[in-house]
């Protein structure tokens, strides 16, 4: 995962398995960023914010896909 905004449009094109894999990777990255922020090593605080928002985007798309399967 690079330092970029994930687009919801791109995420909607991914399968549930791909989204879950990406979510796991992002959560691990987010954990590392939080650690760096805590010890003062985080160079770009915006990266932490962007990672949190990317996690939220993925969770939103996953919820939409799962609700779509039920309907």
Swiss-Prot record:
What CDD domains would the database entry show? Answer: Ribosomal_L29_HIP
**What are the entry keywords?**
Ribonucleoprotein, Ribosomal protein
Q: Which GO terms describe its biological process?
A: translation
Q: Name one GO cellular component term.
A: cytosolic large ribosomal subunit
- Give the matching Pfam families: Ribosomal_L29
Molecular function as annotated in GO: structural constituent of ribosome
- The domain of life for this entry's organism is Archaea
Renumbered to this chain, the signal peptide range is: none
Q: Which NCBIfam families match?
A: L29
Q: Give the protein family.
A: Belongs to the universal ribosomal protein uL29 family.
Q: What is this protein called?
A: Large ribosomal subunit protein uL29
